[in-house]
């Protein structure tokens, strides 16, 4: 069993928090992009569309690598059953809390904003179920995927640990070229699976729960496992934290290919399959870009950084309904897209931080939005000496 390093990986904590918080400008820019969303501005902005595409092309791939890294670290710290329980509680409880408190009111608001409240009774039972699946899971999808991945990794991590006990991990060598070939093959494999499903039974791809539990898990699981391997093998971690011009250039070219596919691809043709191949390798290369950047600039302890690391999940959970409220009721009154984008950031971040501070003072909400039981310090009750 590998010892858990005593030194905290501050840069990984910071990167994970910033990737979470990037969801705020991502969703606000989505309002002003050329992409169709729940709410959109009257005129789209080319630069905000480009900004939105850039964030979307790599953010979650890097996020799941970091999640896999910390998951395996905890896997070595706890017994198997306790590890699964702790991990599922920390992501499952906030997800289940956010559904009635955040995404259900968000869904009701959108029904009236989009004028669909009157047509709801006429929907079939399946359409109601599927609509609720999409709308209630909403931006919480990654928490559901983490629950599924954690359950799958009960077996996967055990196999990895057993294989390590029977082999010499110091002889394991990694190169970005080999990893790129592997992830290219994984992207092609995912594309083949998706195309096969599209040919055999296309309606299942529109099923919300199938999309989240099967397709999203299938795509992001390699990144999750890559994160675990980066924890196990120092050489692999060093490969990601060492700046690489090759990875930076390859990521830039892959992003151009991603944009071209977005602009000229067709959903009825091969756009989604092509995107999966591009974003699979782009995500790998961006792990190097983000990790090396973060390792150089964010590998330090700071009270301010720690605050946002702790607040990032709560802020992400509440930002989505706030963003949609802003888009539905405030965006129409702001003629400038860039001014609207900046106002949206101030509006959403400001209210989210206020709500975060309020919830910290309510023990039940603090538990529900973190999944961590509130521990009372015995020292607080001890008499002064």
Swiss-Prot record:
Its EC number is 2.1.-.-. It is found in: Cell membrane. Pfam families: Acyl_transf_3 (PF01757). It is an enzyme of class 2 (transferase). The keyword Cell division does not apply. It comes from the Bacteria. InterPro entries: Acyl_transf_3_dom, Glucan_succinyl_AcylTrfase, Glucans_biosynth_C. Keywords: Acyltransferase, Cell membrane, Membrane, Transferase, Transmembrane, Transmembrane helix. GO terms for molecular function: succinyltransferase activity; transferase activity, transferring one-carbon groups. One of its GO terms (biological process) is osmoregulated periplasmic glucan biosynthetic process. The chain crosses the membrane at residues 17-37, 60-80, 91-111, 137-157, 173-193, 213-233, 239-259, 274-294, 311-331, 338-358. It is a multi-pass membrane protein. HAMAP family: MdoC_OpgC (MF_01066). Belongs to the acyltransferase 3 family. OpgC subfamily. This is Glucans biosynthesis protein C. The lineage of its organism: Bacteria, Pseudomonadati, Pseudomonadota, Gammaproteobacteria, Enterobacterales.
């Amino acid at each position: 069993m590998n010892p858990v390093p005593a030194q905290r990986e501050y840069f990984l904590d910071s990167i994970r928090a910033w990737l979470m918080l990037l969801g705020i400008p991502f969703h606000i820019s989505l309002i002003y992009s050329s992409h169709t969303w729940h709410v959109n501005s009257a005129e789209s902005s080319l630069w905000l569309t480009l900004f939105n595409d850039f964030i979307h092309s790599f953010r979650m791939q890097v996020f799941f690598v970091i999640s896999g890294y910390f998951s395996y670290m905890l896997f070595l710290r706890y017994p198997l059953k306790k590890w699964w329980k702790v991990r599922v509680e920390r992501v499952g409880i906030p997800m289940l809390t956010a559904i009635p408190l955040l995404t259900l009111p968000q869904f009701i608001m959108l029904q009236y904003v989009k004028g669909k409240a009157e047509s709801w009774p006429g929907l079939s039972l399946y359409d109601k179920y599927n609509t609720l699946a999409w709308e209630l899971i909403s931006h919480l999808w990654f928490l559901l995927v983490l629950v599924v991945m954690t359950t799958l990794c009960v077996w996967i991590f055990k196999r990895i640990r057993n294989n390590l006990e029977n082999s010499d991990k110091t002889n394991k060598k990694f190169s970005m070229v080999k990893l790129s070939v592997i992830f290219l093959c994984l992207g092609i494999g995912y594309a083949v699976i998706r195309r096969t499903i599209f040919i055999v039974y296309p309606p299942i791809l529109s099923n919300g729960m199938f999309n989240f539990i099967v397709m999203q898990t299938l795509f992001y699981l390699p990144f999750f496992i890559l994160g675990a391997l980066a924890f196990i093998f120092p050489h692999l971690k060093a490969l990601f934290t060492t700046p690489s011009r090759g990875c930076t250039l390859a990521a830039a070219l892959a992003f151009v290919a991603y944009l071209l596919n977005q602009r000229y691809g067709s959903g009825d043709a091969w756009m989604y399959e092509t995107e999966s191949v591009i974003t699979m390798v782009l995500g790998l290369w961006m792990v190097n870009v983000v990790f090396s950047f973060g390792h150089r600039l964010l590998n330090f302890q700071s009270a301010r950084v720690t605050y946002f690391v702790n607040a990032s999940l709560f802020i992400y959970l509440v930002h989505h309904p706030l963003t949609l409220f802003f888009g539905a009721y405030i965006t129409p009154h702001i003629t400038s897209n860039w001014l609207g984008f900046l106002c949206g950031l101030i509006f959403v971040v400001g209210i989210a931080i206020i709500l975060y501070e309020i919830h910290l003072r309510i023990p039940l909400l603090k538990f529900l939005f973190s999944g961590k039981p509130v521990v009372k310090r015995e020292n607080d009750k001890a008499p002064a000496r």
